[in-house]
């Protein structure tokens, strides 16, 4: 997979499009099949989540496929003017096409939080530096700990949360409306901040701001020589992370626990491709380790036979990721 700069795009390159919109969709279940049909007809891969509160997800296809999907969404009465952010690659970073029905399009787990009723103040990327340079502003990264580990804004507070569900409790324990008069928040594409700023407003915080379009929009619009971003930005696809040019970054992913890892970390004794890394070595049972090793063997055999991403190799990787996700959940429950 090789990153592509926007100026060098051709019709054969892949667009990676993150999109979301909070909107009342009382009959969202009826959208699933026609939306999936449009994605499949245009060879769009990735996952879209739909719920009564809106739509969210990241998909990829060649330019024509993405344009056709966005055109279809625009024609739906409630789904016009969707927030989108694009990056580019020479390969599709997804293996499958999915539309999932959900209770929430981003899971916070707090009843009654509605960004359509109350939300923080949006701050444009070109105005963000000035805001977070204000000494009276507390800057909070609302993402998960493994995302923050590889990159964040200068002087940002890390809540050390493993999932977004943990954020409300962290905020209750660490933030006070009487002390923290100005709160600025950010996330990857903006959607988590729609919920987190709405929650903060509900908790009595007055001046609550969030980065419009998230980190991805900031990296797109703010020049590198003016940036206050440090590191790379984690993304939830096969690229793992993107750099300031929105090109694939320097991180790989442990397929046992899905954590980002560097080339140097692959040299550690705990790392075995597809089986374990220093993040998960103590959380993987012998039985899981054996399964992961067998799955990795299948992947390598498929690669040796020259089978493509939609063949046995992809199926092996998908099964491996499913097992890794279950193993990660079990490890968290046991703590």
UniProtKB/Swiss-Prot annotation:
UniProt GO molecular function: oxidoreductase activity, acting on paired donors, with incorporation or reduction of molecular oxygen
GO biological process: tRNA modification
Protein purpose: Catalyzes oxygen-dependent 5-hydroxyuridine (ho5U) modification at position 34 in tRNAs.
CDD domains attached to this UniProt entry: RHOD_YceA (cd01518)
Domain Rhodanese: 133-227
Catalysed reactions listed for this entry: uridine(34) in tRNA + AH2 + O2 = 5-hydroxyuridine(34) in tRNA + A + H2O
Stored InterPro entries: Rhodanese-like_dom, Rhodanese-like_dom_sf, TrhO, TRHO_N
Active site, per annotation: 187
SMART domains documented for this protein: RHOD (SM00450)
Family: Belongs to the TrhO family.
Entry keyword Oxidoreductase: yes
NCBIfam families per UniProt: PRK00142.1-4
Gene label: trhO
Keywords tagged on the record: Oxidoreductase, tRNA processing
EC number(s) given by UniProt: 1.14.-.-
EC primary class: oxidoreductase
Domain of life, source organism: Bacteria
Protein name: tRNA uridine(34) hydroxylase
């Amino acid at each position: 997979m090789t990153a592509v700069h926007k100026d060098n795009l051709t019709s054969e390159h892949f667009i990676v499009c993150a999109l979301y919109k909070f909107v009342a969709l009382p009959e969202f279940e009826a959208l699933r099949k026609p939306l999936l049909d449009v994605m499949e007809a245009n060879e769009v891969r990735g996952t879209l989540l739909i719920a009564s509160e809106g739509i969210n997800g990241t998909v990829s296809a060649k330019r024509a496929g993405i344009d056709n999907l966005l055109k279809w969404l625009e024609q739906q009465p409630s789904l016009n003017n969707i927030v989108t952010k694009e990056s580019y690659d020479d390969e599709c970073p997804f293996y499958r096409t999915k539309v999932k029905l959900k209770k929430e399009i981003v899971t916070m787990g707090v009843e009654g939080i509605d960004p359509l009723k109350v939300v923080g103040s949006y701050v444009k990327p070109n105005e963000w530096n000035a805001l977070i340079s204000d000494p009276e502003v507390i800057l909070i990264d609302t993402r998960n700990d493994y995302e923050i580990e590889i990159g964040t804004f200068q002087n940002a507070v890390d809540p050390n949360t493993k999932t977004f569900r943990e954020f409300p409790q962290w905020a209750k324990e660490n933030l006070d409306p009487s002390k923290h008069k100005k709160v600025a928040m950010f996330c990857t594409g903006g959607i988590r901040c729609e919920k987190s700023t709405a929650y903060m407003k509900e908790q009595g915080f007055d001046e609550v701001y969030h980065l419009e379009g998230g980190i991805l929009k900031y990296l797109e619009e703010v020049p590198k020589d003016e940036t206050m971003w440090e590191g790379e930005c984690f993304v939830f696809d096969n690229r793992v992370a993107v750099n300031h040019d929105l090109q694939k970054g320097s991180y790989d992913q442990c397929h046992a626990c899905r954590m980002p890892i560097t080339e140097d970390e692959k040299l550690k004794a705990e790392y075995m491709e597809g089986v374990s890394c220093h993040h998960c070595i103590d959380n993987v049972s012998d039985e899981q380790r054996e399964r992961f090793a067998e799955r990795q063997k299948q992947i390598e055999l498929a690669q040796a036979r020259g089978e493509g991403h939609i063949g046995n190799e992809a199926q092996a990787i998908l099964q491996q990721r499913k097992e890794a996700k279950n193993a990660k959940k079990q490890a968290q429950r046991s703590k």
